[in-house]
């Protein structure tokens, strides 16, 4: 069996490689996908992928596995970055990691390697189960690290080629294995944030593409201007950190795109703005539309928290969702991901908040 392993330079993908080697497979090749954007890097003054590559090389040397670097900068810009920028301009909250997986890691990469490999292995925390020749996406054993949210838009064809060795492990176990075999990157910290940014600050990326535009920060209850911001695209509804005003905590509760105004409120008043009913479209089902929507739960952001909910099908591409509890951070552009027990069924894009 021929196996391709995607290495990022981090501990997770390195242990995924180790687990495959431990199963006795020998026909293995590793790949590092280069998606850094040269213009941004020269603007910000970093070369963050060099450290990744150093670790990739060190890990491959340890296991005597060949590796190759594949450049997907153009594909990433066209298929993920443009989407992200447009969502921000429209005042929405983008989810680029969902499309990074669907369109690049398991899209452009699959097209590039074509039929060369029987299996593609990554360090994602998720599980794939096969039943009656269908592939089902399941949450990882480690619910804190579970990445099914970001994998929710994969197709049957993509899933048929994938193997996630870390789906049955806790992160603590992964760290223990890394130390026990003395991995070169055993002490490397986990990466945070969007897949293509790495050490680049998200706001620097936004500033590069959309610039800055001064606007007022207004207290919702009083209408009083209490600060100045650099552009509505730097803020998301529900945001608490980064507002940089005294007498906090403050929360972003509304954005006026035309007037470039950010409305904020203190915690007690802000929670009154919590919502529970909204519409989603651009729906993707991993195994086709379910026969019923009973006992569904959804995530509206990456993390452990799921909501019980009621779903009402309006059309095949429009669903009304009613949460059992209100949430104070629902924003257009986010993705609502559907679950039944531990199975991830797919997801859809939030486009209108009702109440």
Curated annotation (Swiss-Prot):
InterPro entries: MnmA-like, MnmA-like_C, MnmA-like_central, MnmA-like_central_sf, Rossmann-like_a/b/a_fold, tRNA_2-thiouridylase_MnmA. It is found in: Cytoplasm. Transmembrane segments: none annotated. The record marks 124, 334 as: Interaction with tRNA. ATP binds at residues 6-13, 33, 123. Its EC number is 2.8.1.13. GO terms for molecular function: ATP binding; tRNA binding; tRNA-uridine 2-sulfurtransferase activity. Keywords: ATP-binding, Cytoplasm, Disulfide bond, Nucleotide-binding, RNA-binding, Transferase, tRNA processing, tRNA-binding. This is tRNA-specific 2-thiouridylase MnmA. The lineage of its organism: Bacteria, Pseudomonadati, Spirochaetota, Spirochaetia, Spirochaetales. The gene is mnmA.
């Amino acid at each position: 069996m021929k196996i391709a392993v995607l290495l990022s330079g981090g501990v997770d993908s390195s242990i995924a490689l180790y687990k495959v080697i431990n199963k006795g497979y020998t026909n293995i090749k590793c790949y590092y996908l280069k998606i850094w954007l040269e213009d941004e890097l020269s603007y910000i003054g970093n070369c963050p992928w060099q450290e990744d590559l150093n670790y990739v090389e060190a890990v491959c040397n340890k296991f005597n596995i060949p590796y190759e670097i594949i450049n997907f900068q153009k594909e990433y810009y066209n298929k993920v970055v443009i989407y992200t920028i447009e969502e921000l301009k429209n005042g929405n909250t983008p989810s680029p990691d969902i499309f990074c997986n669907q369109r690049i890691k398991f899209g452009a990469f699959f097209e590039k390697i074509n039929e060369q490999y029987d299996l593609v292995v990554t360090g994602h925390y998720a599980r794939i189960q096969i039943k009656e020749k269908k592939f089902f996406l399941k949450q990882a054993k480690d619910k804190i690290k579970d990445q099914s949210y970001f994998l929710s838009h994969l197709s049957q064809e993509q899933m048929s080629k994938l193997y996630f060795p870390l789906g049955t492990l806790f992160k603590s176990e992964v760290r223990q294995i890394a130390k026990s075999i003395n991995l070169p990157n055993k002490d490397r910290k986990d990466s945070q944030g969007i897949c293509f940014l790495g050490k680049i600050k998200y706001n620097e990326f936004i500033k590069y593409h959309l610039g800055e535009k001064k606007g007022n920060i207004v207290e919702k209850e009083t209408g009083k201007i209490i600060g100045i911001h650099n552009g509505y695209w730097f803020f998301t509804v529900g945001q608490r950190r980064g507002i940089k005003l005294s007498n906090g905590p403050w929360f972003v509760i509304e954005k006026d795109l035309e007037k470039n105004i950010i409305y904020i409120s203190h915690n007690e008043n802000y929670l009154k703005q919590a919502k529970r009913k909204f519409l989603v479209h651009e729906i993707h089902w991993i195994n086709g539309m379910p026969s019923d929507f009973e006992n569904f739960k959804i995530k509206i952001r990456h993390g452990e928290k799921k909501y019980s909910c009621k779903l009402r099908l309006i059309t095949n591409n429009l669903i009304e969702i009613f949460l059992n509890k209100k949430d104070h951070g629902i924003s257009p552009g986010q993705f609502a991901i559907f679950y039944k027990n531990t199975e991830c069924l797919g997801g859809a894009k939030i486009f209108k908040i009702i109440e």
